[in-house]
Structures are given as C-alpha cells and as structure tokens.
C-alpha cells in the first residue's frame, strides 16, 4: 500500500525526489506520514482539500480489503 501511495503522490508533485512516506504500524491501524517539498503541499491538498480527500478515500478502500484501518497525515516541515 505504501508503494501505491508513493506512486500517486510522486505523479502529482513537481519534486518527486523530495517525497517521503513514513509508515507507522499499530495493531489494526497503519498511519502514513507524508512529507513533500513546501511548494508541492498545495498540489497534494488541492482545491478545498479535494485531492487529499480523494487520496484518503482510495487508501481506505484498499485497506478495507485487508481488514486494516489507515490514516494519512501531511507532515509540515519547520
């Protein structure tokens, strides 16, 4: 699932080499922490959050087939 997420994100951004995805696994939950270049954050979120919502919907759909819960968080660099 991490590779699937990476494929989607890298095709949306201008700097795919700066995409970082950290996977944190719990008992029945997987949390993906996404870091992208600062100028690409807007592309990931999309207008009114539509793009990130669509990505999360796809992840939840794939995860439900495997009986796990999934969460996607965008990490902001300081």
Curated annotation (Swiss-Prot):
It is found in: Cytoplasm. Its main location: cytoplasm. One of its GO terms (molecular function) is RNA binding. It comes from the Bacteria. It holds the Pfam family KH_KhpA-B. Keywords: Cytoplasm, RNA-binding. CDD domains: KH-II_YlqC-like. The keyword Oxidoreductase does not apply. PROSITE patterns: KH_TYPE_1. One of its GO terms (cellular component) is cytoplasm. Residues 29-78 form the KH domain. A probable RNA-binding protein. Belongs to the KhpA RNA-binding protein family. HAMAP family: KhpA. PANTHER family: RNA-BINDING PROTEIN KHPA, UPF0109 PROTEIN SCO5592. This is RNA-binding protein KhpA. It comes from Chlamydia pneumoniae. The gene is khpA.
């Amino acid at each position: 699932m991490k590779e699937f997420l990476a494929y989607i994100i890298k095709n949306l951004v201008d700097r795919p080499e700066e995409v970082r995805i950290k996977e944190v696994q719990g008992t029945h939950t997987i949390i993906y922490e996404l870091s992208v270049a600062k100028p690409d954050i807007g592309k990931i979120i999309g207008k009114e959050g539509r793009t990130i919502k669509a990505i999360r919907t796809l992840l939840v759909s794939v995860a439900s087939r495997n009986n796990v819960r999934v969460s996607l968080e965008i990490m902001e660099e300081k």
